[in-house]
């Protein structure tokens, strides 16, 4: 998960236009991944990942920096379009978090990690809360990746927990359990995958469970495109159609010397 900052009015309009302009600039060179689930993998030391996503409910620009071996540091901005009307301002939010890869198997196709931060991914917190002040919701989760069938099937599991400060009229601390799981199936080779995902939150700040299905195409070890459709199981306020990309830079943004790694990014 991740927390929310949402501001409306003139300042929000300026931020909205600035972020959209930056997204459009980046999108001309990149490819995306708009899933809530994550894998065990931390990108090789020094790699910067740029992830723009355009969708019906929200659009996103996420930047991840692998400044240290096994570590990733991420910041993201989300532009909301709750009423499906692009001419109105539905606010924006931000999230900041870190990830540490604890274990990787000898085949380098599975393992587990831990993530922690503030700011929520769209669909993982009550919509009313994402429009409150920043740094109210904090979270931690553990991405686990298990490969099957000679690496043709990859299963990501990501249990976690969150707490929101000053929740409700009594301004209590609200706790929730977060869950997310994703399956990627690539019977035609490693580049093309069919992906399905389920995620949600149970607790005081809970949400309706959502699903997301789509196609992911790994153009190269440095670029991945994804086209998805997401919806709530019992309502129609899900993500809708989304198109996104991931771009991985050469390893130049780093602190110190790192380990030699050989990966296809996920």
Identify the residue ranges that each predicted region occupies.
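Cleavable N-terminal export/targeting peptides
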Residues: 1-36, 252-266
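Transmembrane beta-barrel domains of Gram-negative outer membranes and organellar outer membranes
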Residues: 32-169, 174-228, 232-266
């Amino acid at each position: 998960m991740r927390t929310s900052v949402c501001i409306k009015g003139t300042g929000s309009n300026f931020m909205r236009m600035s972020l959209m302009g930056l997204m459009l600039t980046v999108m001309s060179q990149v490819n995306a991944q708009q899933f809530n689930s994550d894998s065990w993998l931390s990108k090789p030391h020094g790699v910067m990942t740029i992830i723009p996503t355009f969708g019906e409910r929200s659009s996103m620009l996420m930047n991840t920096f692998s400044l240290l071996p096994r570590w990733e540091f991420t910041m993201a901005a989300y532009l909301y379009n709750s009423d499906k009307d692009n001419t109105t301002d539905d606010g924006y939010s931000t999230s900041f978090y870190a990830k540490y890869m604890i274990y990787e198997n000898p085949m380098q196709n599975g393992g587990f990690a831990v993530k922690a931060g503030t700011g929520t991914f769209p669909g993982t917190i009550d919509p009313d809360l994402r429009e409150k002040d920043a740094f109210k919701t904090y979270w931690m989760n553990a991405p686990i990746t298990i490969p099957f069938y000679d690496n043709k099937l990859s299963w990501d599991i990501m249990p976690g927990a969150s707490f929101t400060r000053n929740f409700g009229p009594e301004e209590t601390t609200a706790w929730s359990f977060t869950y997310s799981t994703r399956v990627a199936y690539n019977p035609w080779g490693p580049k093309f995958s069919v992906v399905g995902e389920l995620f949600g939150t149970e607790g005081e700040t809970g949400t309706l469970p959502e699903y997301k299905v789509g196609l992911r195409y790994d153009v190269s070890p440095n670029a991945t495109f994804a086209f998805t459709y997401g919806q709530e199981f019992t309502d129609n306020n899900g993500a809708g159609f989304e198109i996104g990309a991931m771009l991985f830079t050469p390893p130049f943004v780093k602190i110190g010397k790192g380990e030699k790694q050989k990966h296809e990014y996920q």
